[in-house]
C-alpha cells in the first residue's frame, strides 16, 4: 500500500513539474494585440495597427550572426558562454581510460 502511495506521489510531483515547465514556455511570446472593435476611433485603429506591426516584427525577427558549428556548440555546452575559454582541452590533461 505504501509503495502504491509513493508511486502516486511521484506521479503527482512529475505532473506539477511538467505544468510549471510548460507555463514558463507560455511567456515566450508577447501577447497578441486586441482589436479595438468595429466602432473605434481612427486613433485607436492606428494604435492597433502599430501594435500588430510590432507584434509581427517580434515573433518573426531574423536571427543574425554566424551559425555555430557542432564543435562550437559542444564547447559552449562544456565551457559555457565565456569566450575566454579555449575550445580545446588542456595539453596537461591526459585521459587514462
Curated annotation (Swiss-Prot):
One GO BP: neuropeptide signaling pathway
Residue ranges listed under propeptide: 68-97
Location(s) in or outside the cell: Secreted
The keyword Signal appears for this protein: yes
Signal peptide: 1-28
Protein name: Peptide Y
Similarity comment: family membership: Belongs to the NPY family.
Lineage: Eukaryota, Metazoa, Chordata, Craniata, Vertebrata
Modified positions (Tyrosine amide) in chain numbering: 64
Pfam families per the UniProt record, alphabetical: Hormone_3 (PF00159)
GO cellular component, one term: extracellular space
InterPro entries documented for this protein: Pancreatic_hormone-like, Pancreatic_hormone-like_CS
Keywords, in A-Z order: Amidation, Cleavage on pair of basic residues, Hormone, Neuropeptide, Secreted, Signal
GO MF annotations in UniProt: neuropeptide hormone activity; neuropeptide Y receptor binding
